[in-house]
């Protein structure tokens, strides 16, 4: 069956979503067209609004429609003197659900990967270093995904913190090697935060 060029374009757009292959994209496209069209229109409007209005927090780089996100604007969180470094804004959601952290964050939007040409500047490390040198930070918690690149990124940041005399800790057991933080259940992640361990290079 020859498919409409408009439907083909819709399916191709849906395939850009993570985990969506050709069959899933076709299923989603036909579902949107077969169901109440108002739902699809609302989805399109919400997507357009998010794409045009959501930017990055000037302090932590998470997604927000404000110059500074609610967490970074919270004076109580600032006084805690803690920064939790994560790879993605979705990791913030996962950690917030545990209720075990009340400091502020820094989002890398990735991780160091020299083979892919991703260096310190590409993941915002100059901005993080500026915060380390200007804010009264007592502890940096490294909550990167347990991958080779994540470990390399953690070590790089830990050494950077050491230059400023700032303690660094790393979330502990329970997060599987090669896994994504956002996929870890709340209880496991909570234990990993509570059981975080210092990073030493001596």
From Swiss-Prot:
Keywords of this entry: DNA damage, DNA recombination, DNA repair, Metal-binding, Zinc, Zinc-finger
- In residue numbers, the zinc fingers (C4-type) are 57-72
Gene3D superfamilies given in the database record: 3.40.1360.10, 6.10.250.240, RecR Domain 1
Q: Which InterPro entries match?
A: DNA_Rcmb_RecR, Rcmb_RecR, Rcmb_RecR_Znf, TOPRIM_dom, TOPRIM_RecR
Q: Name the residues that span the membrane.
A: none
The Toprim domain extends over 81-176
Entry's SMART domains? TOPRIM (SM00493)
SUPFAM superfamilies according to UniProt: Recombination protein RecR
* MF GO annotations: DNA binding; zinc ion binding
Q: Which CDD domains match?
A: TOPRIM_recR
So what family is this one in?
Belongs to the RecR family.
Entry function: May play a role in DNA repair. It seems to be involved in an RecBC-independent recombinational process of DNA repair. It may act with RecF and RecO.
**Protein's recorded name:** Recombination protein RecR
Q: Source organism lineage?
A: Bacteria, Pseudomonadati, Pseudomonadota, Gammaproteobacteria, Enterobacterales
Gene assigned in the entry: recR
């Amino acid at each position: 069956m020859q498919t409409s060029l408009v439907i083909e374009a819709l399916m191709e757009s849906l395939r850009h979503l993570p985990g969506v292959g050709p069959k899933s994209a076709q299923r989603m496209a036909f579902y949107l067209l077969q169901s109440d069209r108002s739902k699809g229109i609302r989805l399109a409007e919400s997507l357009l609004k998010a794409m045009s209005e959501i930017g990055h927090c000037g302090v932590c780089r998470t997604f927000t429609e404000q110059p500074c996100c609610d967490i970074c604007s919270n004076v109580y969180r600032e006084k805690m003197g803690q920064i939790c470094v994560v790879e993605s804004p979705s990791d913030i959601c996962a950690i917030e659900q545990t209720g075990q952290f009340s400091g502020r964050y820094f989002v890398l939007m990735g991780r160091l990967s020299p083979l892919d040409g991703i260096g310190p500047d590409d993941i915002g490390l100059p901005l993080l270093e500026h915060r380390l040198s200007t804010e009264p930070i007592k502890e940096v918690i490294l909550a990167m995904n347990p991958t080779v690149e994540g470990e390399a990124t953690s070590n790089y940041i830990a050494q950077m913190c050491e230059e400023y005399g700032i303690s660094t800790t790393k979330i502990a057991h329970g997060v599987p090697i090669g896994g994504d933080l956002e996929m870890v259940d709340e209880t496991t992640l909570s234990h990993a935060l509570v059981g975080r361990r210092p990073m030493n290079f001596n």
